[in-house]
Amino acid sequence: MAQVMISQHPLVQHKLTLLRRATTEPKKFRELVRELSQFLLYEATLDLPLQERIVDTPLAPYHGHRIAERVGLVPILRAGLGMVDPILDLIPTAHVWHLGLYRDHATLKPVTYYNKLPPEVDVDLCLVLDPMLATGGSAVAAVTVLKEWGASRIKFLGLIAAPEGVQALHQEHPDVPIHLAAIDDCLNDHGYIVPGLGDAGDRLFGTG
């Protein structure tokens, strides 16, 4: 799939291995999510358009550039929250809107319980953030909500995916690029990615 990009950066693969360890404590887990999110953001924004900007250095004017597009971050609650701050560190002007989607454990289907999108679209690029792309239901639902809202350019950023989730998102929204650190083997009977890393939300926030 041309729209699925898996980072092969050695640091990404090194840190992803540390993230997966069952013995990694929540504090270290959050730090690793932060670092991996920034690596993925770097790769996902390589095509951001630029416009010329002139600034004064201590010696002379300099003809430089600035990002031409307005960026919006859409973390899927709650695990997506762990990816917001590291991205804001690099794009401090980004807008942040929250979508609350939980997976019904009986049907494995997403249920929307929170939506804080403004009345009108005021960004050029939306980045949907969720560390885990498992069944793909939440990601598909989030992108659908954004398109119905009027967003025209959307990308998905996640750390680990199952083939089923990638297929579901790509099939429903083939125009949405998917940026990942890894695609794992499969989903188990409970809808968890295998080998995965467990429940990302629980590990981020020390619950479960």
Swiss-Prot record:
Cofactor binding comment, as recorded: Binds 1 Mg(2+) ion per subunit. The magnesium is bound as Mg-PRPP.
GO MF annotation list: GTP binding; magnesium ion binding; uracil phosphoribosyltransferase activity
GO biological process terms, semicolon-separated: UMP salvage; uracil salvage
Means of activity regulation: Allosterically activated by GTP.
List of residues binding uracil: I193, G198, D199, A200
Pathway in which the depicted protein is active: Pyrimidine metabolism; UMP biosynthesis via salvage pathway; UMP from uracil: step 1/1
SUPFAM superfamilies for this protein: PRTase-like
Cofactors named for this entry: Mg(2+)
Positions contributing to 5-phospho-alpha-D-ribose 1-diphosphate binding: R78, R103, D130, P131, M132, L133, A134, T135, G136, G137, S138, D199
Enzyme Commission designation: 2.4.2.9
One Pfam entry name: UPRTase
Keywords carried by this UniProt record: Allosteric enzyme, Glycosyltransferase, GTP-binding, Magnesium, Nucleotide-binding, Transferase
Reaction equations catalysed: UMP + diphosphate = 5-phospho-alpha-D-ribose 1-diphosphate + uracil
InterPro entries linked: PRibTrfase_dom, PRTase-like, Upp_B, UPRTase/APRTase, Ura_phspho_trans
HAMAP family: Upp_B
Function: Catalyzes the conversion of uracil and 5-phospho-alpha-D-ribose 1-diphosphate (PRPP) to UMP and diphosphate.
Family named by the database record: Belongs to the UPRTase family.
The protein's name in its UniProt record: Uracil phosphoribosyltransferase
